[in-house]
Amino acid sequence: MALRLITAGESHGPGLTCVVEGLPAGLEIRPEDLNADMSRRQLGHGRGGRMKIERDTAEVTGGLRHGRTLGSPIAIQIANRDYENWRERMSPWPAAERIEEVHLPRPGHADLVGTQKFKQSDVRNILERASARETAARVAGGGLCKAFLRRLGVSVYSHVLQIASVRAPEPERALEPEDFASVDSSPVRCLDEQASRAMVREIDELRRANESLGGVFEVQAFGLVPGLGSHVSWEERLDGRLAMAICSIQAVKGFAVGEAFAIAGRPGSEAHDEIFYTSERGIYRETNRAGGLEGGMTDGCPLIVRGAMKPLSTLTKPLRSIDIATLEPAEALRERTDSCTVPAAGVVGEAMVAVVLAAAFRRKFGGDHIDDVLEAVAAYEQRIEWRR
C-alpha cells in the first residue's frame, strides 16, 4: 500500500492545496491535528511581516466524513489571505492590464535556473512556487500522517540546535518525549535556555545588519518498531528516503542521521551501538549513535535526524545579480522576507519525517482499515518479541 503527499499552489496565489493518498479508512482525525502544527510553523523569532497576515487553517474538502478517514485521497485547502493584495498580479486568468515582470534573480534561489529550465521571462513564475510558503501545505498533510502514527504509538518532535554561530550544547542524556513539552515556549524552539537567549540576540544583531541566518534543527521519532525500510534495494533504505524528505525543505542543504559526522572521526569500536539481551528488557542497546537506523531500517531505538539550513537567499541588502532581460549588472530582487526560519523548518521537518514513516508503515503492514493495520503491527511485534 503506497502513501504519497502532493501539494499545489503559489506563495501569493489564491491558496495552497495538499492531497494525501494512502491512509487507511477509519482513522480518527480532529481539526487540531492539522491546524496546531500549521500554527507552530508560523512561530519563531526572526519571522517577517507575512506571518502577521496569514492565520493558516485547514479546510478539508475530501476524504473525511464525520471525523474519520474514508480510505480515499484526503484533500486540504489553505487560503492565502495575502492574495487580496496580489489579486491582479497572481490571477490564474489573463490580466486586464499589463503586469510588470520581475527580471532580477536572487543568488541562492531557484529564480535564475528556473527561468532557464522552464523558458520563463518573468522570475515570479518561478519564485512563487519555489517559496517556502508551500510548506504550510506539507505541514497540513504531515498532520494527517502524525495522527496515523500516534494511533500506532509513534510520536514525532523537533528542536533547534544551532542558529548562525550560536550552538546549543549537546544533551547530556538521550532525550525523551516529555523533554519536548516546553520547546515551543522558546522563541527559537531551542531546549537550552541560555542558548535560546543567545540565538535571539544573534538574530536581532544580524537582522539589523540586513543579514539572514541559517542553522540546524533535529527531528526525533519515538515508538518505532524495528524493520521499517529495507536493506535489499537502495530505494527502500529508510535513511535515503528521510534524506530526500529533509533536503526537499526549502534552504536545507545538509542531512545527518544520529551522530553521523561525529562518528566519522572515531574508530569503529567507538562508533557502533552494542547489542544486549535480558529476559526483562529483551533485545536492547545502551547507546544510539546510529540514530535509530541500521542497514536502511529502523532498529527500535528513537529515530534522530538533523537538517542544516543555509541563510535565506532573500536579503534586505541584495547581492549582485543581473537583469535577465538585458543581461546588465543589477541588484537582486528585494522581496518581503524572514530573517530566520530555522525554528519553523523544524516543524516542517517533523511533517516530512512523519510522511516518510507513515509511508513505511503502509508499505510494510498494508491494511484497508486502521484496525487491519493495528492487528498486523501487533502480530509483527509479537513475532519479533519487541518490547516498547
Annotate each predicted stretch with a short phrase.
Residues 1-388:
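Generic N-terminal targeting/processing segments that precede catalytic cores or assembly contacts
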